[in-house]
Amino acid sequence: MRSNNNNPLTRDEILSRYFPQYRPAVAASQGLSGGSCIIAHDTHRVVLRRHHDPDAPPAHFLRHYRALSQLPASLAPRALFYTPGWMAVEYLHGVVNSALPDADELAALLYHLHQQPRFGWRIALSPLLAQYWSCCDPARRTPFWLRRLKQLQKNGEPRPLRLAPLHMDVHGDNIVLTSAGLRLIDWEYAGDGDIALELAAVWVEDERQHRQLADAYAARARIDARQLWRQIRLWHPWVIMLKAGWFEYRWRQTGEQQFIRLADETWRQLRMKG
């Protein structure tokens, strides 16, 4: 049975209707947010995810489920169940480390993803940046932010080097080291786009780590390393604005202080770079 989007089922209703033998096991964990939880029956665990963004259309949540349905088990957890507002996915047993894997391992994982068939929907950053501007706290809108936004919109997004399915939220907490190797979780922002955009968006510690990843990927993908790095740098202003806007967006939604601190730090980085 599919619930009404205007009156979504509660977690307890989902459990009683679709998972009567399961009980909540862990309230929150790495890669989980917005009311998601782990449910368990004996030793079997499932991740129950909730559509937690009130400003995102239900179609975006459905895309998340469809992305997981398309991906092989060598990359992502299996999609198990969907009803409007909720999905259930396989729980991956393994180790989550806040630090990224080494460059060669991560490059291999991303290259494997980028070799898969495309999802069927493109990632478009310009309208997303505009949405973050319009949905943020009006008191946080600054002339600097507006100038940067208009400049990016005027320039347009870089021409893709190679189009592929992207994860678009690659950081240590979204990578699980399982007994079968590395897997990516939390595919909320997945879509088709430039491989260099994916690499530009990885949450690296510094430029040295970024260059190591780019060089390792270029070697595996047989791309000229200098050409790939130039393309990554073209995407860099877009990615920094994307992160700043997302922090502002989440601050407006949640009021959590961590987001305003991260937003302030990202704006400082942007101002320092002109």
UniProtKB/Swiss-Prot annotation:
EC numbers: 2.7.1.89
A GO molecular-function annotation: thiamine kinase activity
Protein's organism: Salmonella heidelberg (strain SL476)
Function: Catalyzes the ATP-dependent phosphorylation of thiamine to thiamine phosphate. Is involved in thiamine salvage.
Domain of life: Bacteria
Catalysis: reaction(s): thiamine + ATP = thiamine phosphate + ADP + H(+)
InterPro entries in alphabetical order: Aminoglycoside_PTrfase, Kinase-like_dom_sf, Thiamine_kinase
UniProt pathway: Cofactor biosynthesis; thiamine diphosphate biosynthesis; thiamine phosphate from thiamine: step 1/1
Keywords: ATP-binding, Kinase, Nucleotide-binding, Transferase
Protein known as: Thiamine kinase
